C-alpha cells in the first residue's frame, strides 16, 4: 500500500507574513517574477492568500521587482 507523503508548510501556522520580509517572499516567486501556485509551495489556502497579498504590496512599494532584472 502506498501512502501519500504529507508536505509540511514552509511557514509555521500563525507566523505573520509581512511585506517587509523580502527574503521570505522571494521563496514564493519564480525567477521571472511570477507567484508560485499553492500546489508547489505547499502553503495552506489562507497562507497563500496572505503571501500573494504581501508580494503584491512589496512590489508596489518597490521592495520586490515586478519582473526580475537579472538575465
Swiss-Prot record:
Q: What does this protein do?
A: Binds as a heterodimer with protein bS6 to the central domain of the 16S rRNA, where it helps stabilize the platform of the 30S subunit.
Q: A single GO molecular function, which one?
A: structural constituent of ribosome
Q: Which UniProt keywords apply?
A: Ribonucleoprotein, Ribosomal protein, RNA-binding, rRNA-binding
Sorted alphabetically, the Gene Ontology BP terms of this entry are:
translation
Q: Which family does it belong to?
A: Belongs to the bacterial ribosomal protein bS18 family.
Alphabetized InterPro entries for the sequence: Ribosomal_bS18 (IPR001648), Ribosomal_bS18_sf (IPR036870)
- Single GO cellular component annotation? cytosolic small ribosomal subunit
Q: Its encoding gene is what? A: rpsR
Q: How does it assemble?
A: Part of the 30S ribosomal subunit. Forms a tight heterodimer with protein bS6.
This chain belongs to the protein called: Small ribosomal subunit protein bS18
Q: State the source organism's domain of life.
A: Bacteria
Family annotation (Pfam families): Ribosomal_S18
Write down the Gene3D superfamilies for this protein, in alphabetical order. Ribosomal protein S18
Task: Say which species the protein is native to.
Answer: Synechococcus sp. (strain JA-3-3Ab) (Cyanobacteria bacterium Yellowstone A-Prime)
